[in-house]
UniProtKB/Swiss-Prot annotation:
Top-level taxon: Bacteria
EC number: 4.1.1.39
Organism: Nitrobacter winogradskyi (strain ATCC 25391 / DSM 10237 / CIP 104748 / NCIMB 11846 / Nb-255)
Residue numbers binding substrate: 116, 166, 170, 288, 320, 372
Cofactor note: Binds 1 Mg(2+) ion per subunit.
InterPro entries cross-referenced by the UniProt entry: RuBisCO, RuBisCo_large_chain_AS, RuBisCO_lsu_C, RuBisCO_lsu_C_sf, RuBisCO_lsu_fd_N, RuBisCO_lsu_N_sf, RuBisCO_lsuI
Protein's gene: cbbL1
Name under which the protein is recorded: Ribulose bisphosphate carboxylase large chain 1
Length: 473
């Protein structure tokens, strides 16, 4: 065996980390980056630099390289592609050996793949567009605490999307008034009400008071309607210890579901809370607050499809995914892509939806896609078409903004939903015939009729900032 000798100095990254003939292994974690290089840095060198700095390379040769097998552990840039319609950047595909990462730790994956490399001077901008997790890695992660089927069985609700509502105003209500708003919405026909992401334990409403009044509302609405109800109690807290304290109290008062802000609260805290929920029979609703800071810039950051995959591995039974038709960012094709990544057991590569790799989830359960943000009854036909049954449609202002109050707003949404589900079963085209379907239902529901009149002119027609670039192999 030849003995390698140490030679100090600086070499080009491409000499070790650009390998266009590499065939990725089934056990590799694959990444697609969008790279905008600095002037004068060629494509292969920039891609190799990203591969090196996100795996085991550094800026100079070090003698300790001889103490390990770099050919095994290094990341490899193996393919480059043009970005359609944008000649300032390109896609770089990088393969990482699975042994670079701690089992079951999406935190460890992120510290390498989206760590210091994102501040690297050789690239002007860098975006992680997609990841392929091999089934060997998926099997080491906890995933959703329960998943879609278990939640439906717990609630005894099948064959339709679930209905929810975020209580407004999001800040400032007392605990008693907050609970009253929940009760009215639940008895009006909703399945869930929800804490907003920034409701924690502020001076105007401490968390324990909110939990008590809300669960009183939930139990009263259940008794009156005969349906299982719930409220997403946000247990996001300043410390993990306080988070678990709130979760334990929610369990004590028999809440069926709690909530966590997984990006603001942190992936480590989220994985721990998901494990707790799994062990304690509690459903876990996930809010994505802070995501747009990370994913909205089309050239730098992390695409939301990656954040969706990370959440599914980390654990959550629900995830906010945008609405397509509401007030929040998200084009239809991309949204359908990450909805599938959240719910399906196998998602094939589909560049028309921005999916760069096949993704096999094995037997890991999926989660409910949550549509929330600027939606009202006129959006119901499109929402049922886009999101399907395994979703939660959350109308905040579209419930509490009803002229006749919360219960009437909830009733209007329930009637609209059931009309759309029935029409779908009859083979009607919901988006083309939506107006006729809702108008016919409103003839027997004054609450829906008033809701349709109230919001008939409300639209959110703004251009999507992060446009889907459809690329071919």
């Amino acid at each position: 065996m030849a003995v390698k000798s140490y030679q100090a100095g600086v070499t080009q990254y491409r000499q070790s980390y650009w390998q266009p003939d590499y065939m990725p292994l089934d056990t590799d974690i694959l990444a697609c980056f969008k790279i905008t290089p600095q002037p004068g840095v060629d494509r292969e060198e920039a891609a190799a630099a990203v591969a090196a700095e996100s795996s085991c390379g550094t800026w100079t040769t070090v003698w300790t390289d001889l103490l390990t097998d770099l050919d095994y552990y290094k990341g490899r840039a193996y393919r480059l592609e043009d970005v359609p319609g944008d000649d300032t950047c390109y896609y770089a595909f990088i393969a990482y050996p699975i042994d670079l990462f701690e089992e079951g730790s999406v935190v460890n994956v992120f510290t390498s793949l989206v760590g210091n490399v994102f501040g690297f001077k050789a690239v002007r901008a860098l975006r992680l567009e997609d990841l392929r997790f091999p089934i060997a890695y998926v099997k080491t992660c906890g995933g959703p605490p329960h998943g879609i089927q278990v939640e439906r069985d717990k609630l005894n609700k099948y064959g339709r999307p679930l209905l929810g509502c975020t209580i407004k105003p999001k800040l400032g209500l007392s605990a008693k008034n907050y609970g009253r708003a929940c009760y009215e919405a639940l008895r009006g026909g909703l399945d869930f009400t929800k804490d907003d992401e920034n409701i924690n334990s502020q001076p105007f409403m401490r968390w324990r008071d909110r939990f008590d009044f809300v669960m009183e509302a939930v139990q009263k609405a259940e008794q009156e309607t005969g349906e299982r109800k719930g409220h997403y109690l946000n247990v996001t807290a300043p410390t993990p210890e306080e988070m678990y304290k709130r979760a334990e109290y929610a369990k004590e008062i028999r809440a069926p579901i709690i909530m966590h802000d997984y990006l603001a609260g942190g992936l480590c805290a989220n994985a721990g809370l998901a494990n707790w929920c799994r062990n304690n029979g509690m459903l876990l609703h996930i809010h994505r607050a802070m995501h747009a800071v990370i994913d909205r810039n089309p050239h730098h950051g992390i695409h939301f499809r990656v954040l969706t995959k990370i959440l599914r591995l980390s654990g959550g039974d629900h995830l906010h995914t945008g609405t397509v038709v509401g007030k929040l960012e998200g084009d239809r094709a991309s949204t359908l892509g990450w909805i599938d990544l959240l719910r399906e057991s196998f998602v094939p590569e589909d560049r028309s939806r921005g999916i760069f790799f096949d993704q096999d989830w094995g037997s890991m359960p999926g989660g409910f896609a949550v549509a929330s943000g600027g939606i009202h009854v006129w959006h119901m036909p499109a929402l049922v078409t886009i999101f399907g049954d395994d979703s939660v449609l959350q109308f905040g202002g579209g419930t509490l903004g009803h002229p006749w109050g919360n219960a009437a707003g909830a009733h209007a949404n329930r009637v609209a939903l059931e009309a759309c589900v029935q029409a779908r079963g009859e083979g009607r085209h919901l988006e083309k015939e939506g107006k006729d379907i809702l108008t016919a239902a409103a003839a027997h529901s004054p609450e829906l009729k008033i809701a349709m009149e109230t919001w008939k002119e409300i639209k959110f027609e703004f251009e999507t900032m992060d446009k889907l670039a459809i690329a071919n192999k």
